[in-house]
Amino acid sequence: MSNIRVRFAPSPTGALHMGGARTALFNWLFARQNGGKFILRIEDTDFRRSREDSAQGIVEGLSWLGLDWDEGPDIGGPLGPYRQSERGDIYSRYLQELLDSGQAYYCFCSPEDLQKEREEAAQEKRDYKYGGRCKALKPEEASEMLQAGKPAVIRLKVPLDGNTVVPDLIRGDVSFSNALFDDFIIAKSDGWPTYNFAVVVDDFSMQISHVLRAEEHLSNTPRQLLIYRALGLKEPAFAHLSMILAPDRSKLSKRHGAISVQEFENQGYLPEALVNYLALLGWSTGKDIDIWSREEMMREFSLEHISKSPAIYDLEKLAWMNGQYMMRLDIESLMALVEPQAQQQGWLNEDNFDYFQQAVELVRNRAKTRDELLDALGYFFEEVKQYDEKGVKKHFGQQKASTMLSEVLEIVSNMGSFSAAELEEAFRQRAQELKIKAADLIHPTRLALSGRTATPGLFELMEVLGQEKCISRLEKALDFIAKLTTHGPEGHNHR
């Protein structure tokens, strides 16, 4: 395809969420695959709700995801401005063109007049449509009322019969009866255009070839086509992306884990993983592949492979995918991911860098997210403050628990060197001497050293912790078991 120009046009009234990020990604992929341009436009004419910090957050979110744009409010371009709030003169010219051609008119009906019409429609049990009383006003009458300072909106004259067909590249032709529409407002009483008018003028004047956007905008598209045709402008191609639903097929919300892109970044998710996951929300090549590089996505992406059916958001799958990307990181990148938090916690300083690296290496495959990785690192740097409740019942609550840990303490105290291989050999030899399973020594030791029932391999864990820490924690665990035997299981905290 030639001269492909697509845009992502968010309203800065909140954060960049998953739906918006997916829309941006699909536009970006389509542009990059076809050698086209990806334009960022900020639709900020809702002056009451638009916020500059939201606009900045959206820009930062796209940058973090690696979705670079070719034209936009920060870098400019030949067809700007790229903020609607700076395009007032452009909109005014096109509005005047419609007024001059008789395809639009001023409406002076007051809110009270319109409310009365709505109430009459409700009483008669019919859908409300504007009655069109101002359509009959002569130009000189409208001019007199404007000069008198009477507030007015501008309405488009909509054909009373026929259909408006939306040719959709994903859904095929979608037909809307013109009888559904009234003469809808295209400019408010303050002179600023409504969304549907502004977006038509912007897309045409920025030479947008394809409009890829969420399915929720499909109902706006026939109104926009009516505006294109009234102005005699070339229409872009449209493709409406299916909705993203929660696992129970309800509307997606924060309670389903659908947080903003910035919140995912703050939680330490990797941008590559989020981009990969977003791409699979509604796009599939039919290949049984979950992990796609950006280059592979750009090569394979096509509108033909976008589903009409809703995509299902699955936070567990996203976490799994993030884990796959974390496993592929080299140790330096993985350490950089957790260093700020580790330093903040007081875990990392110039004296224990090697120890920190060994700990990260050991637990790296047990974490799907940065926060899980930090959680897995905790007991390497902080004393065990609480033992797992089920673990206490299973491994510390038995009469032999104290005996088992005493045996381990003796083994550990008498070790010359402290390698994982030598520790394992010593444990298994002692288990053989005591005619017990090695697991009878291993499980209570794991709980004593970490407070947990699941960790990386115990002997590797012990080697990293070091002999001194292991002895100290075994002694504390024995003390805890003694109190447990004396006082009963009132609680599992210890200081």
UniProtKB/Swiss-Prot annotation:
Its EC number is 6.1.1.17. One of its GO terms (molecular function) is glutamate-tRNA ligase activity. It is an enzyme of class 6 (ligase). A motif ('HIGH' region) lies at residues 10-20. It catalyses: tRNA(Glu) + L-glutamate + ATP = L-glutamyl-tRNA(Glu) + AMP + diphosphate. Coiled coil: none annotated. It is found in: Cytoplasm. A motif ('KMSKS' region) lies at residues 251-255. Its main location: cytoplasm. The keyword ATP-binding applies. Keywords: Aminoacyl-tRNA synthetase, ATP-binding, Cytoplasm, Ligase, Nucleotide-binding, Protein biosynthesis. SUPFAM superfamilies: An anticodon-binding domain of class I aminoacyl-tRNA synthetases, Nucleotidylyl transferase. It comes from the Bacteria. GO terms for cellular component: cytosol. InterPro entries: aa-tRNA-synth_I_cd-bd, aa-tRNA-synth_I_codon-bd_sub2, aa-tRNA-synth_I_CS, aa_tRNA-synth_I_cd-bd_sf, Glu-tRNA-ligase_bac/mito, Glu/Gln-tRNA-synth, Glu/Gln-tRNA-synth_Ib_cat-dom, GluQ/Sye. Belongs to the class-I aminoacyl-tRNA synthetase family. Glutamate--tRNA ligase type 1 subfamily. HAMAP family: Glu_tRNA_synth_type1. Catalyzes the attachment of glutamate to tRNA(Glu) in a two-step reaction: glutamate is first activated by ATP to form Glu-AMP and then transferred to the acceptor end of tRNA(Glu). This is Glutamate--tRNA ligase 1. It comes from Syntrophomonas wolfei subsp. wolfei (strain DSM 2245B / Goettingen).
